């Protein structure tokens, strides 16, 4: 794979991550900062960015997110139906499924 293709994919991932992070933060900042592994002040800073600033920020050769695989979650996903870790409107107020 060419370096320019890799750079393009990294930038695409970065902008997708920033957009998702901002949507999560706008919905529930406390839950989002925990799920994203960022501080409250970083969450607030991300919320102040407009789309143009997000695109500029994404234009780097560095990943803006860290991917962390959780063995328990992956094992649960492999063993059964889809596991939802974030509360959806349909499941609001219901307990989250246990991870064995």
From Swiss-Prot:
Annotated TM spans: none
Cellular component GO terms held in the UniProt record: cytoplasm
Main location: cytoplasm
Pfam families associated with the record: FlhD (PF05247)
Subcellular location: Cytoplasm
GO biological process: bacterial-type flagellum assembly; positive regulation of DNA-templated transcription; regulation of bacterial-type flagellum assembly
Keyword Signal among record annotations: no
Keyword entries, A-Z: Activator, Bacterial flagellum biogenesis, Cytoplasm, Disulfide bond, DNA-binding, Plasmid, Transcription, Transcription regulation
Listed Gene3D superfamilies: Flagellar transcriptional activator FlhD (1.10.4000.10)
Domain of life of the source: Bacteria
Molecular-function GO terms, alphabetical: DNA binding
This protein's domain notes: The C-terminal region contains a putative helix-turn-helix (HTH) motif, suggesting that this region may bind DNA.
Function field: Functions in complex with FlhC as a master transcriptional regulator that regulates transcription of several flagellar and non-flagellar operons by binding to their promoter region. Activates expression of class 2 flagellar genes, including fliA, which is a flagellum-specific sigma factor that turns on the class 3 genes. Also regulates genes whose products function in a variety of physiological pathways.
HAMAP family in UniProt: FlhD
Similarity comment: family membership: Belongs to the FlhD family.
Subunit: Homodimer; disulfide-linked. Forms a heterohexamer composed of two FlhC and four FlhD subunits. Each FlhC binds a FlhD dimer, forming a heterotrimer, and a hexamer assembles by dimerization of two heterotrimers.
Name of this protein: Flagellar transcriptional regulator FlhD
Gene: flhD
